[in-house]
Amino acid sequence: RDIFLQAWYQGGISIFDFTDSSNPREIAFFDRGPIDDEALVSGGFWSTYWYDGKIYGTGIVRGLDVFELLPSEHISENEIAAAKLASQGNIFNPQQQLKVSWPANPVVASAHLDQLIRSKSVSVEKAQDLRNLLDRAVVLLNQKGKSEELAESLRSVTNSWSVKTKVSEGQLSGLRQILIGISERLIAS
């Protein structure tokens, strides 16, 4: 999923989902309102940054604000949890273009699944089958257990799935890569 933050000099913060670049959508915003109700006074945010699970907004007049996303119809608890797992390196510099990666973790797979469900690209039954497998994987991984049978089920569960849009193809591809990684962890545990 491709989400970006935008700061507004005379306003607040907008959060957009541009996964489908031909149809970007605002999914969240924050705005304190004007500094002065009558006079035009410089305000708003210089910039916003996502780092380590939080959104930092540097205000022109009012200082620093720190935000945390909450689940909504636009972003699920799994997607937020997966975003918090993203590795951006140990150095924070918003001007860098670091490669971001996610671990092979069931919550990351669940985030991909939530996106496919939201776009109506997967049936409820297929989604529930995968959720059941992911629940089993969480238990085994927490116990440092192994299961070649579960690993194989995770690798093959989406083989019969097909999607109709480029965006959904990307989401399904990402899900399959994470499932392969979880499978490898279940064999190597």
Predicted feature locations:
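Soluble extracellular-acting proteins and domains
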Residues: 79-189
